[in-house]
């Protein structure tokens, strides 16, 4: 994999000269291999090593190179046609393949090739972009979107209309990450490389980006870009320094451990006790 990484890095430096008609066959083959590795989960844009998330930028570069290498093509749909550079992940699947991978895909869910979908995952009519990683046992509910290179953990529930932001550029930016056993409430948006740590519960209609204040009402601490593990988060406001107005914030109303979360329903966790 190291040799492939180096070749992708070299090709990316010369990306301005690359077009579908001028690309070297070896470069095309390397990019296709990298996309295939993302598609099968053999490689992923980000992975947790020794408790820290590490981003493999060369895989993002491979995705960006694919847009320069591959030309638009007609993609057949059930009742229409599409025209794009990226084929659909399930275009060549048959019943045996779906059963083997133990996934449910409800029409008209759209998943681009180069994204990984783990076993026992349910995709309602939703959208998963290339480079994304959706781990085992996760539910992607109706009209939820998983952006490019986003990382979704095991046993996550992305409720209806949830938006998980994607990131390809700038290259230095990390992907949005939802760790294992999280619940993201309907119409919430988690973007700009925010990390929602394991076992957290995000209420309906919570919007979190890198500049969003995430206020822990028990400790008074303010976090940016990270929801601590086991947090129960709702929408709220915090007063301005002058005291004349309030500005939006995400409020951590309580913390729960896995044992409590297993015994208590999501609705109970979201009931605020002042």
Swiss-Prot record:
Principal location class: cytoplasm
PROSITE patterns noted in UniProt: HEXAPEP_TRANSFERASES (PS00101)
UniProt keyword rRNA processing, yes or no: no
Places the protein is found: Cytoplasm
Assigned GO CC terms: cytoplasm
InterPro entries the UniProt entry points to: DapD_Trfase_Hexpep_rpt_fam, Hexapep, Hexapep_transf_CS, THP_succinylTrfase_dom1, THP_succinylTrfase_N_sf, Trimer_LpxA-like_sf
CDD domains named among the record's database cross-references: LbH_THP_succinylT
GO biological process, one term: lysine biosynthetic process via diaminopimelate
Residue positions binding substrate: 104, 141
Top-level enzyme category: transferase
Top-rank lineage group of the source organism: Bacteria
Gene3D superfamilies with a match to the protein in the record: Hexapeptide repeat proteins, Tetrahydrodipicolinate-N-succinyltransferase, N-terminal domain
Binding partners and assembly: Homotrimer.
Family: Belongs to the transferase hexapeptide repeat family.
Protein name (database record): 2,3,4,5-tetrahydropyridine-2,6-dicarboxylate N-succinyltransferase
């Amino acid at each position: 994999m190291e040799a492939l990484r180096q070749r992708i890095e070299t090709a990316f430096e010369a990306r301005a000269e690359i077009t579908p008609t001028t690309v070297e066959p070896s470069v095309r083959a390397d990019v296709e291999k990298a996309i295939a590795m993302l598609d099968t989960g053999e490689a992923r844009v980000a992975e947790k090593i020794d408790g820290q998330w590490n981003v493999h930028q060369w895989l993002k570069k491979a995705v960006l190179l694919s847009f320069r290498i591959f030309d638009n093509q007609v993609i057949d749909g059930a009742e229409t046609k599409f025209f794009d550079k990226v084929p659909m992940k399930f275009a060549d699947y048959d019943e045996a393949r779906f059963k083997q991978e133990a996934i449910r895909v409800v029409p008209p869910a759209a998943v681009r090739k180069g994204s990984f979908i783990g076993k026992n995952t349910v995709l309602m009519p939703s959208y998963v972009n290339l480079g994304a990683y959706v781990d085992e046992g996760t539910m992607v509910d109706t009209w939820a979107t998983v952006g490019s290179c986003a990382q979704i953990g095991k046993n996550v529930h992305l409720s209806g209309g949830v938006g998980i932001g994607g990131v390809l550029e700038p290259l230095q930016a990390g992907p949005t990450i939802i760790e294992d056993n999280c619940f993201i409430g309907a119409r919430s948006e988690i973007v700009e490389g925010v990390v929602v740590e394991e076992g957290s519960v995000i209420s309906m209609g919570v919007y979190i980006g890198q500049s969003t204040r995430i206020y822990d009402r028990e400790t008074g601490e303010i976090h940016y870009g990270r929801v601590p593990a086991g947090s129960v988060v709702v929408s709220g406001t915090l007063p301005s320094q002058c005291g004349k107005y309030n500005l939006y914030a995400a409020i951590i109303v309580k913390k729960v451990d896995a044992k409590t979360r297993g015994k208590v329903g999501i609705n109970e966790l979201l009931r605020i006790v002042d």
